[in-house]
């Protein structure tokens, strides 16, 4: 958002939305149910990924969060042999003892299960960490470097540049 718009929004918030008519009840809008939304999203991700994970035996920790339904459909479709943990979200247990904030559980599962690697998402699936077959953490810097090098080799890294935030 432009700074001017953001500042205007802040003024409304600071003044408890004075001057804005808030809709309630039937005035708010309508709800439309789409049962195919998840599959549409998985299809979009699949078509966006230019890779084949055939032969990769991976353990994926979904943090009892947003990635639980998506990952279980996407990664096998990419050819990976997958075992999933943290796939029972109940609205209260997101990140509880699982996911990228508790990587030790994935590291242990990878070593004990003989997996090639592990991937752990955070609850809202906007970040992930990983580990190698020995359970050694692979942080975001390493993951980005590997992805950038692979994209560069394939001529898909615009300007040979990866742009990230300090939180990456």
Regions found by a protein language model. Name each.
Residues 1-113:
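Gly/Ser/Thr-enriched, mixed-charge loops and adjacent short helices
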């Amino acid at each position: 958002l432009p700074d001017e718009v953001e500042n205007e929004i802040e003024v409304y918030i600071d003044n408890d939305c004075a001057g804005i008519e808030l809709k309630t009840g039937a005035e708010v809008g309508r709800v439309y149910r789409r049962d195919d939304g998840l599959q549409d999203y998985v299809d979009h991700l699949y078509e966006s990924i230019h890779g084949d994970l055939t032969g990769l035996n991976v353990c994926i920790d979904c943090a009892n969060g947003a990635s639980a339904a998506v990952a279980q459909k996407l990664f096998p479709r990419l050819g990976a042999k997958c075992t999933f943990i943290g796939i029972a979200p109940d609205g209260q247990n997101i990140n509880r003892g699982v996911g990228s904030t508790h990587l030790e559980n994935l590291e242990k599962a990878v070593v004990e299960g003989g997996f090639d690697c592990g991937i752990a998402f955070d609850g809202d699936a906007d970040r992930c960490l990983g580990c190698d077959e020995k359970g050694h953490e692979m942080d975001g810097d390493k993951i980005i470097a590997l992805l950038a090098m692979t994209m560069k080799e394939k001529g898909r890294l615009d300007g040979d540049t990866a742009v990230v935030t300090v939180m990456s």
